[in-house]
Curated annotation (Swiss-Prot):
Annotation: DNA-binding region: 257-269
Biased amino acid composition, Basic residues: 542-554
Annotated Tudor domain residues: 4-69, 83-147
N6-acetyllysine modification, residue list: K841
Keywords: Acetylation, Chromatin regulator, Disulfide bond, DNA-binding, Metal-binding, Nucleus, Phosphoprotein, Repeat, Transcription, Transcription regulation, Ubl conjugation, Zinc, Zinc-finger
Protein's cellular compartments: Nucleus
PANTHER family named among the record's database cross-references: PHD FINGER PROTEIN 20, PHD FINGER PROTEIN 20-RELATED
Protein name as catalogued: PHD finger protein 20
Residue ranges, compositional bias (Basic and acidic residues): 147-246, 292-325, 483-493, 525-541, 886-902
Region (Disordered): 142-373, 483-609, 804-827, 877-902
Length: 1010
């Protein structure tokens, strides 16, 4: 039965309705209705900012649901105080962005929950709360009415007289700003120009307002209102009469002895008496800046709260702390950039170029000098050039950071100049020259900061604007496919050298700027540094086949960029640090446990170690100078001449795949010889003392998803070498003594398997011969021998012929036996059986003719016979997989497998009447050819006959070789006499004893495991 929700004041029972709900911990949270169950009379409540797993069903008349009236009433009251009413669609407003700054936007929708959907002027659409939307025309009133939450006790005074005076100043400033906004809207056609005017005051005050914030708030995100609130502190600090500063802009620039470079347009004491004069001056400054199209400087870092005397003392005593603090507070190139207003550029220049270096400078001026000494100097940032603060110190810091990051020579050529000396040197610079150099340096800035606080893309025909430099960097990298151009690295550096040629040598700065470097404060740069080190560590590893499982691997001792910078700050030779780096990062290629090497590898180890250390010490000193593209190439820096032949065993990338599923490399590592993956020795129960001679990991021993027979594929060396597993405590291993016989037997088995495959191919060819209408018969329109090296007409046969011709020289390798046999005929002494077996028996054991047959079997006859067999057995697959007989049954009905004589009888009976006329016709020189089908059958029949002869010859050779092997075993006494039952009791006793011993071993293993 459907129920109707109750009528509760302030709560509308519909999906998405806002309310407050109390959870089971008796805490009230803002929530909304997720779902309504009309049959049960309940609602599903979702608590805001909590996961959906905390959603809870409430009865809709539950007392634990209440409306949001109180919060809404309180917020409405705040709106009334701020003087902002509800905004309409298409109304121009100031909306708060994620950096807590307000930007011009237009309302596109008014939502039910009290939020607004606004569209910023760069096209970004966002939903913001109503407390983050302000009226566009009343921007400065909102800022002015906001009371400061926390101010510095040195900057603000609580006396009522000063408060009254500041209120008057603020009112006048607001009127001036309104006039500016109106004129700017008329004269300039830029959409965000009013916002620039709205923030005219805050831009200059940012550097002093930052002084009043505590140190733990190290965020470059401040509201406009916060900057305005700190304005009062700035006004109290400089309480000196500055009415004489209100002059022409040209006079302002030429006046050298200004105590404090405060812009005349925002001097609080001058506003009262000269408000009419301020307006044209400000507009003139703005027009000049717009015509120059100069990019706005970046925001300065915060100043310390210490007194000027303490700061100068601290500066002289703790220069190292200054450097580290500068590094930590520095903004990365792709980080968030906050932008000063363009009108504050000229006042900053006037404020900085102070030609009075005497100690009676005002405290505020000293504070600003201290703040400028800590200004960011990064590649791509030209704030130092724009504000023209002491450039020598900035360049010195940059060189120090470059030298910390690069591994090259001249590590500490450039020493940071003392700050006081820099202030004195910069005081001699003339103001017009400074402005000229500022304009030069502005053109080199890559993140183009537009006057309306946008970063503009420099690519032609691209009209994209971005609010942050990081977004512009992403756009350039992923949209245009361009990394950072060389302009931000070299441009500012060259400008600095031209401006302050006396501070730093030109050559050193050029060298340091051309080096590849990474910012110490950028987190992305740290990650790039670590990935580059990891790539370099992987590139210089060498894996000798005999020693690759016996390496000790340790973690790099100094992988971090901080450690590198700390180490390289000391003026030590770079080669020493390179050797330290080699000893840490590349220990896998150098340190090997001496217990794990055989006698033949002992002297080999010393060569490897010295050679690798020498090579690494030279190569790793240049490792940080490599670019990203050079890292992708294989660089052979540690090639041992003894191991150049084993090129297949060099692996540039190593994988740690252990049962513990931890990807770290620590302590003793062991490598699988099959998949080249590394495992922790502790996890596998192996120590340096008990490493097996051949190690295979748990995955290769039992590969998942494979057939059961593949489980033993890793242990295939006994097929080619004849060494089978035996008991370690036995002095004489049976397989080691009889390795040659095992290998020879396996080769015979491989040859027999080949013959079986060729016979199966013969069956298919016989089925083709049975019917004249078989579609594959036309493939034999030409004789086989003319096309044996050129392939066939049918693409399938061409493919298989090529595969056979490639497989034929190395067919035994596929069976796991030996390497490719020599194509040349071998002599009697070089044949396999003669060289390895027959030397133990009399040479006259076989007649000379039989010996020659045996030699043919393993010599040229083997390859000459097997190659056509492989080519003719065109339907056989890889010998590793065996022969799938059912695969090609679609070719025709296959008779039972015929032996050689039966095949010949069958051919002579069935095909002889067709063969004879064809032969006669050919003998007569082609007089009156028979039909084409008869010719095709004749070609195929000729091929089958030749193949049959080769198979017969091959079987005879295998039989003779088998006789040689068996007779040699009889001669050496390895095989028992013809009565094997005579040893049966002894054999039973040995088997029982072996079973007893295995039972004891199993009990011991159980006891040890428990």
């Amino acid at each position: 039965m459907t129920k109707h929700p109750p009528n509760r004041r302030g709560i509308s029972f519909e999906v998405g309705a806002q309310l407050e709900a109390r959870d089971r911990l008796k805490n009230w949270y803002p929530a909304h209705i997720e779902d309504i169950d009309y049959e049960e009379g309940r609602v599903l409540i979702h608590f805001k900012r909590w996961n959906h797993r905390y959603d809870e069903w409430f009865c809709w008349d539950s007392p634990y649901l209440r409306p949001l009236e109180k919060i809404q009433l309180r917020k409405e009251g705040l709106h009334d105080e701020d003087g902002s009413s509800e905004f309409q669609i298409n109304q121009q407003v100031l909306a708060c962005w994620s950096d807590c700054r307000f930007y011009p936007a237009r309302v596109t929708a008014v939502n039910k929950d009290g939020t607004y959907t606004v569209k910023f002027y760069d096209g970004v659409v966002q939903t913001v709360k109503h407390i983050h939307v302000k009226a566009f025309s009343k921007d400065q009133n909102i800022v002015g009415n906001a009371r400061p939450k926390e101010t510095d006790h040195k900057s603000l005074s609580s006396s009522p007289e000063k408060r009254e005076k500041f209120k008057e100043q603020r009112k006048v400033t607001v009127n001036v700003k309104k006039d500016k906004v109106e004129k700017a809207l008329k004269t300039e056609k830029r959409p965000k120009q009013p916002d620039k005017e709205g923030k005219l005051i805050c831009s200059e005050k940012g550097k002093v307002s930052e002084k009043s914030l505590p140190k733990n708030e190290k965020e470059d995100k401040e509201n406009i209102s916060e900057n305005e609130r700190e304005y009062s502190g700035d006004a109290q600090v400089e309480k000196k009469p500055e009415k004489d500063l209100v002059k022409n802009p040209q006079e302002n620039l030429k006046e050298p002895k200004r105590k404090r470079g405060r812009p005349p347009s925002i001097t609080p004491t001058a506003v009262d008496s000269n408000s009419q004069t301020l307006q044209p001056i400000t507009l003139e400054l703005r027009r000049r800046k717009i015509s120059k199209r100069s990019d706005t400087p970046l925001k300065r870092p915060r100043l310390d709260k210490n007194s000027p005397q303490e700061q100068s003392k601290k500066r002289s005593e703790n220069s190292d702390k200054d450097l580290s603090r500068r590094r930590s507070s520095r903004l990365s190139t792709n980080g968030t950039r906050e932008i000063l207003d363009p009108d504050s550029i000229v006042p900053d220049l006037v404020h900085t170029v102070d030609t009075n270096p005497l100690p009676d400078k005002s405290p505020s001026a000293k504070d600003s000098a201290e703040g400028q000494l800590k200004s960011p100097l990064e590649a791509g940032q030209v704030s130092s050039a724009l504000t023209c603060h002491p450039i020598g110190d900035g360049l010195g810091a940059a060189d120090l950071e470059l030298n910390c990051k690069s591994m090259g020579e001249n590590t500490m050529k450039t020493e940071p100049v003392s700050p006081l000396a820099e202030v004195q040197e910069v005081s001699t610079v003339e103001v017009p020259n400074t402005l000229k150099k500022v304009d030069d340096s502005v053109t080199l800035n890559v993140p183009a900061v537009d006057l309306d606080h946008k970063f503009r893309c420099k690519v032609l025909d691209c009209l994209k604007f971005f609010r942050k430099a990081k977004l512009l960097h992403y756009h350039m990298k992923y949209f245009h496919g361009m990394e950072k151009s060389p302009e931000p690295e070299e441009g500012p550096g060259k400008t600095h050298v031209q401006t302050r040629g006396s501070a730093v040598p030109d050559k050193t700065s050029q060298e340091s700027l051309t080096r590849k470097r990474v910012s110490a404060s950028s987190p992305t740069a740290k990650e790039k540094e670590k990935t580059k080190e990891k790539k370099f560590k992987e590139l210089v590893r060498v894996k000798p086949k005999k020693k690759k499982k016996k390496k000790k691997k340790t973690k790099p001792e100094c992988p971090c960029s901080e450690d590198i910078s700390d180490t390289s700050q000391e003026p030590s030779p770079p080669k020493t640090f390179a050797v330290t780096r080699c000893g840490s990062s590349h220990k896998p290629g150098v340190h090997m446990s001496p217990q794990l090497h055989g006698s033949d590898n002992g002297n080999h180890k010393g060569k490897l170690k010295t050679c690798e250390e020498d090579n690494l010490s030279e190569s790793s000193s240049e490792s940080f100078l490599w670019s990203d593209e050079e890292y992708g190439q294989d660089v052979d820096v540690t090639t041992n001449p003894d191991e150049e032949l084993e090129g297949d065993d060099r692996y540039d990338f190593e994988v740690v795949r252990c049962i513990c599923e931890v990807q770290e490399e620590n302590d003793f590592m062991i490598q699988c010889e099959e998949c080249q993956c590394w495992q922790h020795g502790v996890c596998m129960g192996l120590l340096e003392e008990n490493v097996p001679e051949k190690y295979t990991c748990y995955v290769c021993q039992d590969p998942p998803g494979q057939r059961p027979g593949f489980k033993y594929w890793y242990d295939k060396e006994w097929l080619s070498r004849g060494h089978m597993h035996g008991l370690a405590f036995l002095d004489q291993n049976y397989s080691h003594q009889n390795a040659r016989k095992i290998v020879a037997t396996h080769q015979l088995l491989g040859d027999v398997q080949r013959v079986i495959q060729v016979l199966h191919g013969l069956q298919l060819k016989m089925s083709i011969l049975q019917s004249r209408e078989h579609p594959d018969l036309q493939l034999w329109c030409q004789p086989w021998k003319q096309h044996s090296g050129e392939g066939r007409a049918h693409p399938r046969h061409i493919h298989i012929t090529d595969a056979r011709s490639e497989e034929s020289p190395s067919y035994r390798t596929l069976n796991g036996a030996v390497e490719k046999p020599s194509p040349l005929p071998r002599s009697v002494e070089e044949s396999y059986i003669t060289s390895e077996h027959c030397y133990q028996k009399p040479r006259a054991y076989y007649p000379a003719v039989e010996q020659r047959l045996v030699v043919e079997t393993r010599g040229s006859a083997l390859d000459a016979a097997v190659s056509p067999l492989c080519e003719n057995g065109d339907d056989s697959l890889s010998p590793r997989l065996g022969w799938p007989i059912d695969q090609d049954r679609s070719r025709g009905d296959i008779d039972p497998k015929p032996s050689s004589p039966k095949v010949r009888e069958y051919i002579s009976k069935n095909v002889l009447p067709e063969e004879t006329p064809a032969r006669k016709l050919l003998d007569r020189g082609g007089e009156g050819l028979v039909s084409s089908q008869h010719q095709w059958q004749f070609n195929l029949l000729t091929h089958v006959e030749s193949l049959q002869d080769e198979v017969t010859h091959r079987m005879d050779s295998i039989e003779k070789e088998l006789d040689v092997l068996e007779s040699w075993l009889d001669y050496t006494g390895e095989l028992e006499p013809p009565e094997p039952l005579a040893r049966l009791p002894q054999l039973k006793h040995c088997i029982k004893q072996l079973l007893t011993d295995l039972g004891k071993v199993q009990q011991i293993a159980l006891c040890c495991s428990t």
